Amino acid sequence: MSKPTLAVIGSGIAGLSAAWLLRNQYQVTLFERHARPGMGAYAVSAGTNQRTGKAVTIDIPLRVITSGYYNELFNLYKTLGVEIERTDHSGAFFTHTGGDIFHYKTYTIGERRFAFLNSPKRLSKHNISQGMAAIKFFAEIKKVDLSNVGNLTFGEFLQQWPHSKANFIDNVLMPMLSTICTCDYDSVKQYPASIIIGYLACGVAKDGVWKATHGVADIVQRITQGYQVEANCDIQNIKIDDTENSPIQVIFNRHQQTEKQSFDHIVIATQPQHAAPLIEAAAPEIVQHFKHIKYAKSSMVVHRDDSIYPRPWQDLSPVCYSINPSLQRPMATVCLNKSMPTVKDCLPIFQTWHPTTTIAADKTLADVTFERPVINFDTLKHIESIKQSMLKANNRVWFCGSYLGEGIPLLEAGVQSALFVANQLGAYKPW
Ligand SMILES: Cc1cc2nc3c(=O)[nH]c(=O)nc-3n(C[C@H](O)[C@H](O)[C@H](O)COP(=O)(O)OP(=O)(O)OC[C@H]3O[C@@H](n4cnc5c(N)ncnc54)[C@H](O)[C@@H]3O)c2cc1C
């Protein structure tokens, strides 16, 4: 008997995971508007590694992960055979005028890794006091009983928590969180406290940061086996007839031609702001929920312009934050040569989030603007309604994306949301 057909719209981590998890039970077609699957759509070539002579590709964004927080993603990578490697994301914090705030570095002794103050050159009374505040903060945040912070925003929680040292919160913690959540400080403070604490308490500071050794291209190659991928297909509309078992029509533009295909089920794995226009006519009541989910824009530049760093930059920790108190976000630059083993022997190359100074155009390799949902208590109500809509009997329209998982919309949440949909459609976790 032939399998039922299923369309997945969008090939970020959520769509790729859903398509892969459902490939045995359904005849799956994955549609992506970019020329390459979305997770790897913005990768850029960065020349060759001068030691190995191998070509180097840089993913945009890098997509780093931590073992304590990314349970399902680690399981997925293991099942797919994706190798992972450690990266160094320790930080150097400066004011926008170049004044020292805080420097820490990751040290390795045998198998153990730990964060501590950077080189003696950077030791100062101020740096030591920030270091002590950080140690205290991360030790105490693990002890917070999440059931006691249920109604608090993260901002409210910080205001009443005795371990919140204003200097550390404003100059170190908020710049880091604003970079991780890619939104402004006010939006970070509007996150439910339990979500941010859940992230901070998961050993982020202790176990360090990892990434896929061979980058997103390797993940995509493994996770696109066993089903059909249709790139360059910009979905315009989805037509759903309420009559039971009537096919769902997917209408899309490919190379300036309009095409149409029919499916038994559909998984919309785009971000919420892109899902709404697709189902405006077919499911207006759900569109209202999508329209309430806010998103933030952020830009990322990959470049070779070292003037972005305070001098001398060579001994700084890999991630350099520039903090201007009159702005709502820091500028954060990763020196990829220091952070990633595969890029160590390449010409200097940097990835800057939210540039606030000019990066030389002739040293720029890529400049990409991203959108990403931000979570607050109002958003959570609408997300819950979207989840409930999928539990209706005989439902055939499914949604997944990192905004529908638990916690911060990161890769882990994307995989969680795909597992939820796969489970509803009769496919179980292969791990
Ligand atoms: C700057 C930045 C840095 C980040 N760094 C990290 C990190 O280090 N670690 C981490 O865990 N997370 C990180 N994230 C978050 C992570 O990238 C997201 O959580 C994740 O990409 C969301 O996956 P998704 O599948 O839900 O959505 P997306 O990745 O947005 O995928 C949706 C896909 O749908 C496609 N699409 C949309 N509309 C249509 C249409 N009409 N037709 C066809 N296709 C369509 C899009 O092109 C896209 O490919 C970062 C995010 C940003 C913005």
Predicted regions and their residues:
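N-terminal glycine-rich dinucleotide-binding loop that anchors FAD/FMN and/or NAD(P) in oxidoreductases
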Residues: V44-L73
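Helical element adjacent to the flavin cofactor pocket in flavoenzyme catalytic cores
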Residues: I196-Q257
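Mid-domain catalytic core of redox enzymes
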Residues: Q236-I375
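Mobile amphipathic helical/loop "lid" adjacent to a hydrophobic cofactor/ligand pocket
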Residues: S67-K189
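Glycine-rich FAD pyrophosphate-binding loop
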Residues: R23-T48
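Conserved Rossmann-like nucleotide-cofactor binding loop
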Residues: A14, R36, Q273
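N-terminal Rossmann-like FAD-binding beta1-loop-alpha1 element of flavoenzymes
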Residues: P4-L30
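Conserved flavin/dinucleotide-binding core of flavoenzymes
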Residues: R329-W431
